[in-house]
Amino acid sequence: MIKLNLPVHSIAHARAGDKGDVSNISLIAYLESGWPIIEKLATKEKVLEIFKHMGATRVDRYKLPNLRALNFVIHSALGGGVNSSLRLDRHGKTLSSHLLHELKLPISKDLLPINSPYLKKFND
């Protein structure tokens, strides 16, 4: 089966929240078929590497299989938190978009939603 290295947003969506200098990002598979690859390959090590440039020091990962989701708790990623950060996005809401774009996974055509623009890449 052909697999392409695609951004995780091709098979999942995400939400971000914050508490102090800690961000949490939930990564949720669109389809049941996308859950196993997210569970297996979206590791805390990969997420830490994506956010290290922002000062992240540790990532904890929690599985929520009934929701087809992972929750990543990213420590020290918000520049001190909403009250002390000088960043434009002090709550870290855009971090979910950053994760969706930067985390690349080997995705097969059958994991994509039927309206995915990435389906064209498999026909090229």
Listing of model-derived features with the role each one plays in the protein:
Residues 1-124:
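Long, contiguous binding/interaction regions
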